[in-house]
């Protein structure tokens, strides 16, 4: 990057420090959690993106430890608002910024401290959060909707597939693989929700999972009745 635009990496690091790292370490925002107040998808979504920033930049060990501590606390506050059934009370359209961003947080934390965080994927509640999107799927691109949630909640793909692998869910892996193959725009370049394609980590996750998604053997679907 510096060869093409001298000084750009220094500018990027300076802006990320000013806009993300310094505010995160010196201020308290409501989505970080502070007791019993209800939280939403902002918590997991913002926390995921902060963690990406912290661990991709040449941050100090002290900053990294502080980020892990705050992220773990924020996710505890986020999870308190989920029942054991894993229902996303914001609906299917918000799943990708709520439950799926929770996967992003845990995936990053598991790579940083695998012994501490990887076992969390074996928790029943985490698996139920992962499989919520399967349980409200109707057919093709359609989902059960309520509130301000669209019935066209967007296709599943690589992140759902990796979440399914992490929690041991054949149903989620199958839905993700089937949806990815059926998607005429798997890179989401035409999606009006720009958050699905401007995140380079999402794009890399898709790139590294594409071969698996295209060759995954789809099991016979199970007929389950789920109540939320």
Annotate each language-model stretch with its function.
Residues 1-93, 203-218:
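Active-site lining segments of carbohydrate-active enzymes
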Residues 97-228:
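Carbohydrate-active enzyme catalytic cores, enriched for enzymes
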């Amino acid at each position: 990057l510096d060869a093409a635009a001298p000084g750009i990496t220094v500018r990027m690091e300076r802006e990320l420090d000013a806009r993300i790292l310094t505010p995160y370490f010196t201020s308290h925002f409501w989505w970080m959690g502070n007791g019993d107040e209800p939280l939403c998808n902002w918590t997991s979504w913002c926390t995921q993106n902060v963690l990406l920033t912290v661990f991709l930049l040449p941050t100090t060990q002290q900053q990294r430890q502080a980020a892990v501590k705050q992220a773990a606390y924020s996710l505890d506050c986020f999870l308190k608002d989920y029942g054991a059934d894993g229902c996303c009370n914001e609906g299917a359209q918000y799943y990708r910024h709520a439950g799926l961003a929770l996967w992003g947080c845990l995936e990053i934390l598991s790579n940083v401290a695998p012994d501490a965080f990887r076992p969390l994927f074996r928790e029943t509640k985490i698996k139920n959060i992962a499989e919520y999107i399967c349980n409200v799927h109707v057919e093709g691109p359609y989902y059960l909707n309520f509130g301000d949630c669209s019935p066209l909640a967007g296709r599943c793909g690589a992140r759902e597939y990796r979440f399914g692998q992490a929690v041991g869910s054949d149903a989620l892996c199958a839905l993700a693989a089937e949806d990815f193959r059926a998607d005429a725009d798997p890179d989401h370049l035409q999606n009006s929700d720009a958050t699905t394609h401007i995140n380079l980590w999402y794009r890399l996750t898709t790139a590294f999972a594409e071969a698996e998604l295209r060759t995954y053997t789809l099991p016979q679907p199970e007929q389950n009745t789920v109540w939320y």
